[in-house]
UniProtKB/Swiss-Prot annotation:
Keywords: Amphibian defense peptide, Antibiotic, Antimicrobial, Disulfide bond, Secreted. It comes from the Eukaryota. Disulfide bonds join C24-C30. Has antibacterial activity against the Gram-positive bacterium S.aureus ATCC 25923 (MIC=18 uM) and the Gram-negative bacterium E.coli ATCC 25726 (MIC=18 uM). Expressed by the skin glands. This is Brevinin-2PTa. One of its GO terms (biological process) is defense response to bacterium. It holds the Pfam family Antimicrobial_2.
């Protein structure tokens, strides 16, 4: 349903942001 799709989209966005933060910390590019 629409709600499930919205939650999936939000979860993906959050995961991407967390990955970006983790990556910049590892590479010290923050």
């Amino acid at each position: 349903g629409a709600i499930k799709d919205a939650l999936k989209g939000a979860a993906k966005t959050v995961a991407v942001e967390l990955l970006k933060k983790a990556q910049c910390k590892l590479e010290k590019t923050c």
